[in-house]
Amino acid sequence: MKKEQAEILGFVPQKEIVYNKLLPYADQLDRESNDILAQIKGNLGRAVQLRELWPGVLFWTRKLSTYLRLYGRKFSKEDHVLFIKLLYELVTIPKLEISMMQSFARLLVNLLKKKELLSRDDLELPWRPLYDLYESILYSKTEHLGLNWFPNSVENVLKTLVKSCRVPESATQEMLDEWRPLLCPFDVTMQKAIGYFELFLPTIMPPEQHDKGFKLWFDEMMNLWVSVQNLPAWEGNLVNLFARLANDNIGYVNWDPYIPKIFTRILRSFNLPVGTSQMVVPRYLTNSYDIGHVVLWISSMLGGPQNQSQKQLNGLFSSIASFYHPSNNGRWLMKLMKLLQRLPASIVRRLHRERYKKPCWITPVPSTHKLTDQDVTDFVESMKQPVLMAMFSKTGSMDAAQALQNLALMRPELVIPPVLEKTYPAMETLTEPHQLTATLSCMIGMARSLLSGGRHYPEGPAHVLPLLMRALPGVDPNDFSKCMITFQFIATFTTLVPLVDCSSALHDKNDLTEMERELCSASAEFEDFVLQFMDRCFALIDSSTLEQTREETETEKMTHLESLVELGLSSTFSTILTQCSMEIFKVALEKVFNFATTNIFETRVAGRMVADMCRAASKCHPAESLRLFVPHCCNAITHLTANEDVSNEEELDKELLWNLQLLSEVTRVDGEKLLPYRTQLVQILQLTLRLRCKQGYSLACNLLHHVLRSTALIYPTDYCSVPGGFSRPLQEYLPIKDWGRPGDLWNLEIQWHVPSTEETAFVFYVLDLLLQPELQRLQRYAQGEQEMSRDDVLQSLCIVQHCLLGAGSMLPPLDGSTVTGLVPSMVNLEETKLYIGVDYDQSRENYREAVCKVMRQLLHYILEHSEDDTKSLFAIIKIISDLMHFKGSHKHEFDSRWKSFTLVKKSMENRLHGKKQHIRALLIDRVLLQHEMRKLLVEGCEYKTVHQDLLRDLLRLSTSTYSQVRSKAQNVLFTALGTYNFCCRDITPRVLEFLEPTRTDVTQQQFKGALYCLLGNHCGVCLANLHDWDCIAQTWPAIVRSGLSSAMSLEKPSIVRLFDDLADKVHRQYETIGIDFTVPENAVFLGRSITNSSQPTPHMGTPEDQELQQGLAVQQAKNREAEQKYEKLVKDLLECLDDRDLPWKFEHIAIGFLSLLLRDDYPLPAPAVFFFVQSLNHDALVVRKMAIAAVAGILKQLKRPRKKIPVNPCDISGVTEPEELEAGDRPGNDWLQYHSESLPNSQQDWDAFCFVEKTHWGYYSWPKKLMVYAPAAEQPKDLAPDTMSEREAIINDHFTDPTFINQLIKFLSLEDRKGKDKFNPRRFCLFKGLFRNYSDAFLPVLKPHMERLANDSHESTQRCVAEIIAGLIRGSKHWSFGKVEALWAFLIPLMRTALSNITVETYADWGTCVATACESRDPRKLHWLLEMLMECPLSGEGGSFVDACHLYVLQGGLAQQEWRVPELLHRLLSYLEPKLTQVYKNVRERIGSVLTYIFMIDVALPYTLPTKSPHIAEFTERILSQLKPLIEGDEEIQNHVVEENGVGEQDERTQAIKLLKTVLKWLMASAGRSFSTPVPQQLQLLPLLFKIAPVENDDSYDELKRDAKTCLSLMSQGLLYPEQIPMVLAVLHEIAGSSSWHARYSVLTYLQTMVFYNLFTILSSEQCVQGVRALVIRLLEDEQLEVREMAATTLSGFLQCNFLAMDSSMQTHFEALCKTRLPKKRKRDVGSVMDTIPSVDLVRRHAGVLGLSACILSSPYDVPTWMPQLLMDLSAHLNDTQPIEMTVKKTLSNFRRTHHDNWLEHKQQFTDDQLVVLTDLLVSPCYYA
C-alpha cells in the first residue's frame, strides 16, 4: 500500500490523515492532494518572491492550513522544513501587522505540532527573533499609551508558538546570559525573567548534551525555589518549568533530595483548611500552583529504583483523603478534584509513551526508570480510596468517572470490583437516585476495561448481563436525569457487545473455557433483555403523549427535556438493534410494528418517539422492515384520502397524519432498498403534497425530503461492532469472542451507499415530476400571470425547499463569471475544487440555477406587492441560504456531530494502547465526518456574479420593513460574507449608502438594518472593522456622518444602543493595521527554495526578473499608499468633527475612532495633534479624558531618541567579578548604591557620574553589555522654538499660553467621582512627556499654579499637583545639572508645604506620586527628594496622623529603590527604633509596614551575599532586650493605655507592651510580603505570643490579643526549612511546660497547622516525628481538661492524615492508662463540696480514654482492623465518673454519625458478639428504665 502510494505521490508523506483512505473515492485523493500541494507551493513561493503579503501570501497560507485539515501533514520532510522556515521568517518580520502575524503563527504552530516528525537535525530555529517579537508585544512600551492595539488572543498564540519551537543546543547558555541579570527578587523583572525561563528554556535534548542544557541552570533554579518561603508570583512559573523538565527527562534528573520539599509545597498549594480559626494570606490563593503542571511533575517523578515519590504520594493522598468525602465542600474542592481527574490520565500517558509509542528521535525513558507493573499497582492502590469517595462528590461524578476510566485501563481488577459493589445496591434503591447516576456514569467510563477482562480480570464480562437487566427500571418517565444516564449506560454496553444468543454453542463446541461457557449460557437472556427494554420504552412513550403532559392551551412543540429523551431513546434503541442477531431483530421488529400500527399517536411528542423507534428498525435491516411498513402505511393513506374532500380540510384525521409521519421516518434508509417501492411512494407524494392542512403537507414534504436524501447521498450503511454483522452460523463464528473488541482501522470494511445510476435517474424523475410544476406556478405568480393565496405560495415554497434539501448533493454549485477588480494581485487567487464523490450530470437541467432564478423573481415580486407576507419571506431566505451553501449537509449539524463524536470518543477511548483503538461505529462516524468536512469546506470561494446578485437580495431583505425578516436575512448574509473572497469590498459601499446624510428616502427600518449589517454577529465578519485601510476609510467616516442623516433619531433607544454597540465593538476588536508591508530578503530566498523544490513540482516556476522588479515596485507603492490612506482617514474624521450640526454622541464616536489611529511607527498628522491639544480643554469630560491619553501618546511619538553607550562595570568599581555566581551587595556593585558622602552636588560631579536608572541591573549578575546613556555633550540639544517640527510647535504654543494653561489646570483640579478618584497615570504620562520633550520650557507658566494648588488642601487640587510633580520629576531625567538644581530648589519647599497639608483623602495620592517619581531612577539623581523625605517623618508636629502619612510617602519612595539605598534604610531604622512605642494604632500599622520594607532586602536566597541593608537578627535582639519585663514576669499581660498627659516616664512594663503592639503589626505585615521568613527570630518571640493569645474565638478581645492570635496563625502556616523544624519543636516543648493552660492549649492548635503545612518535610526526619508525638502524648495527660481534649483532637487529626501511625505501642500505652485504678469515693456528708481538683489517677485514666477515642475518630469513613477491639475497650468506661463518661458518649455518637451511611459495609468488620454490645451502646438508653 505504502509503496504504491509513494509512487503516485513521488514522496513519503510525513503523517497523513488515515481516514481519507477509507472514503469511497479514496483512489482519487492522492492525485488530488498532489495537485493542490503543487498549487500551494507554486503560488505561495511566488507570492513571497513578489513580496505580496496581502492578499497573496495570506491567501495561500490559509490554503495551506486548509490542506492540513484535509490531508494532515501529507508532504515530504523537505517541504515540511521549508514551510516551517518560511513561516518562521514571516512571523518574525518586524513591524508586521498583528493580525497577519497571528494568522501565520497559528499555521506555524500547526506545522510544528507533532514533535516526533522532525528531529533537531532536521530543523533548528533561532530563538532570538521570537523573543524580540514576544518582548515587543507582551512588554510593549507603547501599548499603554494607546499607540498599539493588540488582540487578547495574541499572548496565548505566541506562548504556544514558543513552546513548539526547537532551538540549537547553544541556546540555553545564551538565554541564561540574557535573562540572569534580571533576577532581582524585589523587582518586577524577576517575574519577567522566570516567565521567560519557563517559556523558552529547552528541555528535550539527548543525554550527551545535558551539560549544555538543563544542568547549566538546574541547581541554581532549584535552590532558588527551595529557599523562597512566601510564594511570590513567580514561584508558580518555576514549578511549571520543573514539571516540563521532569516530563522530558524522566530518569535523567535526580529529584530524590528534593522530594519531601516538593510534596510539602504541593500540599500547601491546595490551601486546605486546618484547625479552627485560620487566617489566609491572600497571595496563597492567587499564586498557587497550576494543577496541570503539578500532576505532570508528580507523574514524571514516579518509578525508579527507590520510587520515593510513590511513598510521598501515598502520604499525600492519605493526608487529603477525608477532604474528598461528599460531606465536605469548599473552594479548595475544585483543585482536589482536578488533581484526581488528571493524575491517572497523566500516568496513562506516560505508560503509553514507555510501552506502546513508536520510538522516534526523542530520547526514550531509560529502562531503569520505566514504570514497572508493581509501580503501577502501587499507584492505583494509592488513588483508589479518594476516587471511590469522590464518586458522590458535590461537584458531580464526572471527575471521578474520568479518573476511574484511566485507572481501570491500568488495573481493572483493583478498581472495577469496588465500583460494582456500589453499583448493584444503587440499582436496587429507589430513594437515592443520585447514587444511581453517579455509579452508572463511572461504569460507563470503565465499560471497555470491564468487557475486555484480560488475564488480570477474567470475570469482568460475566457482569454485563446482570448489569443490563438491572439497569432497565431506570427507564423511568418520572425522573429525567436517571432516564438519560440509563440510556447512555445501555447504549455504551450494547455498542460493545453483540446481542447474539450463543447458548446452542454449548452443545456443538467442546473447546470452550469455563468463562466462555458461562457467557454462552448467559447470552440466552439477550432476547429477553431487548423485549423488556422495548416494553419500558413503550411505557415511557405512553406517559409522554401530548394529552397527558399538556393543558389545552400550551404549546404543541416538544420541550427541551422531551427532545433529549427522544434523542436518548432513539439512539439507544438503534444501537441495540444494530447489535442484534437476525433472530432477535425479527422478534423486535414484529413487536415495534404491532405497537406502531395498532395505536394512533399524536405527531408532536409520542408520535415522534415511536416513529424514531421504527426508523431505527428499518435502518438496521431495511429490506425486512420496509416489507412490513411501506405497504401498511401506503394502503392506510390511500384509503383515507380516497374521499375528494380530504384534500381541502383544514384539520386532518389523526390516523392519516400518523401514517404519514410513520412513512416519512421509515424511508430514511439505504436508498437501494427503497427503489422497489418507488411507484407506491411517488403515488403517495402526489396524493399528499397538495393537502390543504399545513400539518399534512409538512409531513408529506418530510417524506419527499427523506426519499430524495436516501437515494442521493453518500453515507455508510452499517455501524455494527464487527464487520459483516452476526448472521454467520455459530460453528464458524462465536460472537462472545468479540465482546469489547475495538474496530480495526485497517480492515474496517465500511459498506458505503453510493447513488447508482438507477437511483440518480429516480431522483431526477421525482424532481421533474414534483419540483418543476411548483417552479412554473411560482414563476407565473411572480410575473403577475396567476393569482395564488399566501398559503399556496408558502406550500409551494415548502416543496421547493424540501426538494433542495433532499437532492442538494446532486445539484452542481451555482456558477458564472467571477466579479473582478475588487483586489489587485500579482498572484493567482483561484479556488480549490475538492472531489466529493459526485459526478454532476451536465446533460440534465441544473435545478439549483432554476430555483435561484425563480426565487429572485418571486422575492422581488413579494417585496413590491405584499411585503407583509413574512412567512414566505422566511422560506425564501432559507432557500437562498441552501442555494449558496448546501451540498448535502449543514455546517451547524456538522459542528454538533463533531462535538458529540469527541465526547463519545473521550468517554470510551483507550489512551494506554493508543493507535486509534476505538470501536468500529465510532471509526465509521469519523470517516463520515471527514467526508462531510470535505463537502463543507468553502474557504476561499471565488465571488461570482450569481453570488453578487444573491448577496444584494439578502442586503435588501436585511434592510426591509419587518425586524424578524431583517434579522434572519442578516444571519444568512453574514455567513455568505465569510465565504466568498473579498465580497465585503463589494457589499460595504452598498450598506453605507443607507447611512448617507444626503439621502432623504431612507426609512428608519433601513437605517437600523444597515447598522446591524455593519455590526455583524458574534462569530462572523464585522464590516465596520475589517483590518484593511480601504474598508475602514469608508466605514468609520460614514458611521460618524450618519449622525446627520434624517433617519437617525437619538430619541429611539434601539438606535442609540446600536451606535453604542458599534463603537464598543470597533474599540474591542480593533488591532493596529500595518503601514509597512516590507518582505525581508531571507523570506524571498526561502520562497525561491519552495518554487525550486520538487515532489510535487510547483505548478508554476520562479517569477521572471522583471516580475520581481515589478513586485518590489508594487510593494513600495503599497507602503506609500497605506500612509496616504492613513492620513486621509484622519483628515476625513477631522472634517466630520468640524461640522457644527454633528450631535454630541457622534462627536464622541469620532474622537474615539481618532484615538485608535495613534501608532508608534508613523506620527499623527499635525491637524489631528492640534485637535487633540485643543480638546484638552473641551467641555465634555469624556472628550478631555480621551484627549489626555492621546496627547500623552503624541508626546511619546515626538520623543527624540537618546544615545546609549556600553560600559564595563568592572572599570567603574575597580573590582574584577568572581568566576562563580555571586549575587546581592558585593564590592562590584557598591558604586550603584547611595552614599551621602559622595553625591553629585556640582556640575562636574554630575557629568562624571555613571547613572544606572533601572533598579535590577547589577544585583544578581551583570549583563554582557551594560548600556547607559552617553554623556550630555553627545545627546541632542534641548528643543528651541526655531528648530521645532510643526507638531512640536503646536504643543509648544498651547502650553506656553497662560490662558490655555489656566483653563487646563482648572479642569484637571475638578473632582470626577467623589471619593472614587485616584492618582491618574494617564495625566502623569502627559506631564512626564511634556517635561521630557521640552525640558523646563513650560515651568514658568506652571509654577504659580503649582504653588496655588499645593497650598489648597482640597482632595482634587492636591491630586492635580501630585500628578504634575510626579511627571515633572520623571520628565527631568535628562535635564542638565543647572536645570535640575533649579527644579529642586523650587520643588522641595513646594512639597514640604503640600505634605504638611496632607489629609486622609490625599495621602495615598502623595504616596503614589513619590513612588512613581522614584521608579526606575538612579537614587543619586534624586538625592534632594530622598533627603527631604527622610527629614521629618516622625517629628510629631502635625500629630500622629500626619506622621503616619509622611511615613507612607517615604516608604513609597524607598520601596521603589529596593537594594540601592542601604544607608537610608539604616538611618530610617535608627530613627524609628526609639519611636516604636507609639500610642496610636494607625501610626503603629504604618511603622509595621515600613519595617517590612526595611527588612525586605535581608533575604536568605542562594548565591546571595549578606546585605548591607539592616538585618532582622540584630533588630530582634535589641527588641527582645526591651521586651524582657514581659517575658520574665508571670502575671497576665493587659493592654495598658495610659493617658497622653500622664506625668513622668511610664514604667518599663507599659513601654514594653506598647512596643510589643508595634512589633505584632510588623510581624503581620511581613507575613505576606517578604521572600523568606526569619524563623529563628520569630521563635524568640513565640513564648510571649503564646502567653497573650486567647483560646476562644471572640472578637471582643482587645487589639493586642487579637493581633497575637493572628500572628500565631500566620506563623504556624509558614513554610519551614528542614533545619528549622527541630528549633521550633524545642520551643514548643518548652512552652508546653508553661504554667498558663492557655499557652499549653495554643501549642496544640499551632502544632496542628504547622505539621499539616510542612507535612512531608517533617515526615522525612524520624526524630521530628517522634518529637511531635511525644509532645501530643504528654499533653494528653495535662491537668487541665480543655488541654487534654485538644490534645486528643490533635492526635486524631495526625492519625487521620497519616502523620502518626496507630501502632501497637500506642495502643498498649492507652490501654494501660485506661486501667489506672480510681480511688474509692469516700462517703461524704451530703452538704460537703466535692474536691474540685481531679486526682492524678483520674487524669491518667481520662488520658487513656481520650487516646482510644482519638484513634476511633481518626477513621471517620471506614473501619480498620483495630477499630472493633478499641470500641469494646472504650465501652467498658461508659459508667466511669465524669469527665470520662462524657468523652465516651461523645465518641460513640460521633462514630454512629460518620459510619451511618455505609453501615451495611462496615458491619462486616465486627464479630457477632461485638455487634450485640455495639447495638446496645449505640441505641439511646430507654428513658423509662
Swiss-Prot record:
Gene Ontology CC terms, in alphabetical order: cytosol; nuclear speck; nucleus; spermatoproteasome complex
Top-rank lineage group of the source organism: Eukaryota
A GO molecular-function descriptor: peptidase activator activity
UniProt keyword ATP-binding present: no
Annotated region described as Bromodomain-like (BRDL), given as residue ranges: 1632-1720
One matching Pfam family: HEAT_PSME4
GO biological process per UniProt: DNA damage response; DNA repair; proteasomal ubiquitin-independent protein catabolic process; sperm DNA condensation
Keyword Nucleus assigned: yes
Keywords noted in UniProt: Cytoplasm, DNA damage, DNA repair, Nucleus, Proteasome, Repeat
Cell compartment(s), UniProt: Cytoplasm, Cytosol; Nucleus; Nucleus speckle
Start and stop residues of the HEAT repeats: 458-502, 981-1020, 1162-1200, 1336-1374, 1618-1656, 1662-1700
Protein purpose: Associated component of the proteasome that specifically recognizes acetylated histones and promotes ATP- and ubiquitin-independent degradation of core histones during DNA damage response. Recognizes and binds acetylated histones via its bromodomain-like (BRDL) region and activates the proteasome by opening the gated channel for substrate entry. Binds to the core proteasome via its C-terminus, which occupies the same binding sites as the proteasomal ATPases, opening the closed structure of the proteasome via an active gating mechanism.
Description of how the protein assembles with itself and partners: Homodimer. Interacts with the 20S and 26S proteasomes.
Comment block on domains: The bromodomain-like (BRDL) region specifically recognizes and binds acetylated histones.
Family affiliation: Belongs to the BLM10 family.
Designated name of the protein: Proteasome activator complex subunit 4B
Originating species: Danio rerio (Zebrafish)
Protein encoded by which gene: psme4b
